[in-house]
Design a protein with these regions (language model features):
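Asp-based phosphoryl-transfer active-site loop
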Residues: 1-7, 84
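Short, contiguous strand/loop micro-motifs
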Residues: 3-4, 71-72, 143
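Short beta->alpha junction loops/turns
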Residues: 6, 77, 149-150
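Short secondary-structure boundary/capping elements
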Residues: 8-12, 54, 125
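Active-site phosphate-binding/coordination module
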Residues: 13-114
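Conserved acidic, metal-coordinating active-site core of Asp-based
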Residues: 87, 91-177
Length: 177
């Protein structure tokens, strides 16, 4: 793991990665976070300078940091957003968010909880609450993020796997997501 429990790259790790890049090694970092959420870490280990890569959204997006080119991008079928939103809101009573990297914001439907606030802070993005999340999404989406109490999220994962597992990858990235 690149970052510690404090979500920071240690100085020793930073120096080792930079040294490896100086020796000609190519570095890629992978995260479940959005591109915006990884940019500070990428800058800290100087991926842009050395031509490294960022793999965001649990592998759905790959960016060449030197050129800024997106070399791989797998988005959700837009027709899946409404059923997942309805399941989150009506069946489960959960917060659901969508990253909008171009605007450096997190769109939140069905309210904002402490977990959404923590994610926005960690990713250095703003939160924009919307009344109709499905209608507000007029851009490609890589990931829908549901949040709630850890014990409840275990059941949520099971429920959503049963409901959408044949069409979507459903998993928890943290106890509360």
């Amino acid at each position: 793991t690149l970052v510690g429990t404090d979500k920071q790259v240690s100085e020793a790790t930073r120096e080792a990665i930079i040294e490896a890049q100086q020796r000609g090694k190519t570095v890629a970092i992978a995260s479940g976070r959005s591109i915006s959420g990884i940019r500070r870490t990428a800058a800290k280990i100087r991926l842009e300078q050395f031509g490294g890569y960022v793999i965001a959204y649990n592998g759905t997006t790959v960016i060449n940091c030197k050129t800024g080119e997106c070399i791989y991008n797998q988005t959700l079928d837009h027709d899946m957003i409404k059923p997942v939103y309805e399941a989150a809101e009506k069946e489960l009573g959960l917060g659901i968010t969508v990253y909008h990297d171009e605007e450096k914001e997190l769109l939140a439907g069905n309210g904002v909880d402490a977990y959404i606030e923590a994610d926005a802070k960690a990713c250095d993005i703003t939160i924009r609450e919307v009344n109709d999340l499905v209608r507000a999404i007029d851009f490609p989406v890589n990931k829908l993020l549901l949040s709630g109490e850890p014990e409840k999220m275990k059941q949520v994962e099971k429920h959503l796997c049963e409901k959408f597992g044949d069409r979507l990858n459903v998993f928890r990235s943290d106890p509360y997501y």
